[in-house]
């Protein structure tokens, strides 16, 4: 089995400006191999696996549904996940799915790539998918899991997260068939399966293997694993800790939802910090060109300010505006750890001093809503923050958080040109640009 270093060394997305290191109390991390300038690209990573974030059977959003699972009324290419323009004559469907779309609609499936046929932005994407991510087995499995086979109905009565887990497992098992080497990389990523498979693994493994057991590849010397309950549980653990969401365009009301999830083998090694020094960008809807059409799902990580050699490079796993209690809850539930970064230490002291979490949240919200001019007054002339400021992250939010209403994205300069830093800041959520007039 490949080691983490093998993964980092073999993936073509790896760059010479970061290296793997062991940091006490944090485990494996990516650190700067040299001094980095603001806006410098430290990683460009391609996914080894992508799957749709749209449930097999979409339902009307409910207040209890996570905002990231509430989807706008858009369709996406089932290969590159660009927005589909149905008026375009190049849009094509999967030849197998389109044969069953009418039957699926009768059973309540519908169409448009959500629960009926799978659509592609053109013949090239369809050909690529049919040979990789949307093989005949995937097509059959998704159709049966969706609603074409009556015995799959129990899945459709489960919450939408379970349906997305089913999508992931189909994609992961297919990866084992079409690319055993990439499947090995997936298995090497962080995420330990529980000693005993949980309810999700038990249910999904039994369901998938009763409806559409994956075929074993023939004549592959690389194939040395078997599809088992233990493997299903291990895969779900990898997905939980390593999947990155490719976001839909920011809605007018500020809703942030995911169009697809991807496993990025190098980007998975970035640790979290609540005041990150880097942020990731994706350009899924970038115009397709002869050279870029296959790279639109890449992740690009840029540092947001100068970083000295040897410093760990961290991302925030969620929008930086979340308050202390929400951040700790998400990190504990989704990633299994408690954050002790500098920001969390300060805000934990607020909580201890006040003795009331509600007061802490209220104080944060008030600070977040302060006028930018007032925040700047709290900063020192050299760009630092006044030591007596009760909100020591004010400068970070002022300079590196997008001020577009309901966006909460992180700003990073465009890459330097000929060694000269850019004064243009780009938001990694809404894509807005602004001139950096901070000192």
Regions found by a protein language model. Name each.
Residues 32-35, 259-262, 304-307, 331-333:
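A general structural signal for short secondary-structure junctions and capping/turn motifs
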Residues 52-174, 274-439:
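C-terminal SET catalytic tail plus cysteine-rich post-SET Zn-binding segment of SAM-dependent SET-domain
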Residues 1-52:
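N-terminal alpha-helical interaction blocks
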Residues 156-296, 333-334, 340-343:
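Catalytic cores of histone-lysine modification enzymes
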Residues 11-14, 71, 264, 396:
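A short, polar/charged loop/turn motif at coil->beta-strand junctions and beta-hairpin connectors
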Residues 32, 42-43, 120-121, 270-271, ...:
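Short hydrophobic-aromatic micro-motifs
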